[in-house]
């Protein structure tokens, strides 16, 4: 499978990206290289390989839930640029 410059331009348009002509050629080449690599991977015989979700076995490593000293309110607010009493004041993000 080969990707054309027009297909890269179409995907860029969908993503609302603008590329110069040289960038378009670079991305077209890179996408085609990725697809060639994927074709090579598809040719590999994996019939005896068990499917995995991770390359190595993962085990949950939980720490014991212990009560311990935490950061005091004064220390946590010490570097706040504009604390409001005992709270962090942040810019409004929703109108």
Swiss-Prot record:
GO terms for biological process: glutaminyl-tRNAGln biosynthesis via transamidation; regulation of translational fidelity; translation. Gene3D superfamilies: Glu-tRNAGln amidotransferase C subunit, N-terminal domain. This is Aspartyl/glutamyl-tRNA(Asn/Gln) amidotransferase subunit C. The keyword Disulfide bond does not apply. Heterotrimer of A, B and C subunits. The gene is gatC. It is an enzyme of class 6 (ligase). Belongs to the GatC family. One of its GO terms (molecular function) is glutaminyl-tRNA synthase (glutamine-hydrolyzing) activity. Its EC number is 6.3.5.-. Allows the formation of correctly charged Asn-tRNA(Asn) or Gln-tRNA(Gln) through the transamidation of misacylated Asp-tRNA(Asn) or Glu-tRNA(Gln) in organisms which lack either or both of asparaginyl-tRNA or glutaminyl-tRNA synthetases. The reaction takes place in the presence of glutamine and ATP through an activated phospho-Asp-tRNA(Asn) or phospho-Glu-tRNA(Gln). Keywords: ATP-binding, Ligase, Nucleotide-binding, Protein biosynthesis. Pfam families: GatC. The keyword Transmembrane does not apply. It catalyses: L-glutamyl-tRNA(Gln) + L-glutamine + ATP + H2O = L-glutaminyl-tRNA(Gln) + L-glutamate + ADP + phosphate + H(+); L-aspartyl-tRNA(Asn) + L-glutamine + ATP + H2O = L-asparaginyl-tRNA(Asn) + L-glutamate + ADP + phosphate + 2 H(+).
């Amino acid at each position: 499978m080969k990707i054309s410059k027009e297909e890269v331009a179409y995907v860029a348009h969908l993503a609302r990206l603008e590329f110069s002509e040289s960038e378009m050629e670079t991305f077209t080449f890179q996408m085609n290289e990725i697809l060639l690599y994927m074709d090579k991977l598809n040719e590999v015989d994996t019939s005896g390989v068990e499917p995995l979700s991770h390359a190595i076995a993962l085990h949950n490593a939980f720490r014991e839930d212990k009560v311990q000293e935490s950061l005091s309110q004064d220390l946590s607010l010490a570097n706040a640029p504009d604390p409001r009493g005992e709270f962090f004041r942040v810019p409004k993000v929703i109108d």
